[in-house]
């Protein structure tokens, strides 16, 4: 099944952001970051099933996953595994014995380290995925997903990625070296998901989420040295638009001015911003420490989409679950250029300093513009 590939279709340039009218306030402080640790995993019977050891019982992770039944634990020993693992058995756990010594390596040829496709209740933990053409760890069309103590670096799209997935948690994990986002949750409402205690650095975007929100919490995490830090956004190129009702609390976001590494076009547009609400509405941004950005610390700006397939939905549709709106008919005629608003956001109680344009900014478009 081909992976859904996200592309931001833009005609705007970085000058679009600079041209937006801004109103700024600021306050000073400083801070640092924390990194996630590694856990040691033991063998033995799973909580509800058996333990399948790799390579003791099965030579490859894929063979063990294919043999697993609900409730089983696939326990992976130290080593480098040149595999692209597809998971289609629900309610299993795939766990490495050592996060830094259990390595899935795509050798710049394989698509995804571990892909969970339309399968519920899959936990992946305590391992590393690197050098994949697309993603390190990927859940799509899945419910009750969990990724914990994971490292994903130098992958072609995303590090750790959940798409059209619900009731999930990504925690104590690290993402680096992705041209798109180190962490991404997209196309879900209400997502009922949390990103907690992660570190994302040296990516195009530290965090990105298109058309996602609703009980979606991004908390207690560090986003640093990316082209842009955190960028919830909207667009008709994916379903369930717009992005809305994210809760971004207690994060440390700093020095997202990275120039030398990989970056998709959208990350070039967003570069130099800490928390950028790009056409995303009704979000809560509170008690974050944000500092040292060449453009803005925290900003909410309209997002320009060229060749859009639809316009923003009416307010009466904003509380509808994604499943109720994703099959609605599109307009017979494409609306062409659409500007997604960034309204209704609550940005309070943050500590922001060292911003080149404004510590806190709101972008507006002149009437008739």
For each of these PLM feature ranges, what is it?
Residues 97-101, 120-131, 143-158, 166-181, ...:
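Right-handed parallel beta-helix
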Residues 50-59, 73-78, 84, 90-133:
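Right-handed parallel beta-helix/beta-spiral solenoid domain characteristic of secreted/periplasmic
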Residues 61-68, 81-89, 104-105, 138, ...:
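Short, T/G/N/S-enriched strand-turn elements that build extracellular solenoid repeat scaffolds
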Residues 72-75, 306-369:
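Acidic, glycine- and Ser/Thr-rich low-complexity intrinsically disordered tracts
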Residues 3-14:
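Bacterial N-terminal signal peptides that target proteins for export
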Residues 28-30:
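Bacterial signal peptide processing site
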Residues 22-26:
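C-terminal motif of bacterial Sec signal peptides marking the signal peptidase cleavage site
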Residues 65, 84-88, 112-118, 135-141, ...:
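Glycine-rich beta-solenoid repeat tracts in large extracellular/virion proteins
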């Amino acid at each position: 099944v081909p992976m859904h590939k996200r592309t931001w279709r833009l005609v705007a340039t970085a000058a679009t952001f600079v041209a937006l009218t801004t109103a700024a306030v600021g306050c000073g402080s400083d801070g640092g970051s924390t990194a996630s640790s590694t856990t040691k995993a033991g063998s033995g019977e799973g909580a509800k099933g058996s333990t399948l050891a790799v390579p003791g019982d099965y030579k490859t992770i894929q063979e063990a996953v294919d043999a697993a039944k609900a409730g089983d634990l696939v326990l992976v020993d130290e080593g480098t595994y040149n595999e692209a693992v597809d998971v289609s058995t629900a309610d299993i756990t795939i766990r490495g014995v050592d996060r830094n010594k259990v390595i899935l390596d795509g050798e710049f040829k394989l698509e995804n380290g571990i892909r969970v496709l339309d399968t519920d209740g899959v936990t992946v933990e305590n391992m590393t995925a690197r050098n994949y053409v697309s993603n390190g760890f990927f859940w799509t069309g899945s419910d009750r997903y969990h990724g914990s103590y994971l490292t994903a670096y130098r992958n072609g799209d995303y590090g750790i990625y959940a798409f059209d997935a619900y009731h999930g948690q990504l925690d104590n994990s690290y993402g680096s070296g992705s041209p798109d986002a180190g962490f991404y949750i997209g196309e879900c409402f209400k997502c009922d998901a949390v990103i907690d205690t992660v570190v994302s650095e040296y990516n195009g975007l530290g965090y990105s989420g298109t058309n996602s929100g609703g009980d979606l919490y991004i908390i207690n995490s560090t986003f640093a040295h990316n082209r842009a830090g955190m960028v919830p956004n909207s667009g008709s190129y994916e379903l369930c638009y717009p992005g809305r009702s994210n809760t971004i609390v207690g994060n440390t976001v700093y020095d997202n001015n990275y120039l030398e590494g990989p970056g998709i076009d959208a990350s070039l547009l967003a570069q130099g911003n800490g928390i950028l609400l790009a056409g995303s509405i009704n979000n809560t941004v509170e008690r974050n420490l944000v500092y040292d950005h060449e453009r803005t610390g925290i900003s909410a700006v309209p997002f320009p989409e060229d060749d859009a397939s639809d316009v923003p939905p009416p307010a009466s549709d904003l509380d509808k679950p994604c499943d109720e709106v994703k099959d609605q008919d599109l307009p017979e005629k494409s609306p062409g250029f659409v500007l997604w608003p960034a309204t209704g956001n609550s940005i309070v109680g943050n500590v922001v300093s060292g911003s080149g344009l404004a510590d806190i900014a709101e972008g507006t478009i002149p009437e008739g513009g």
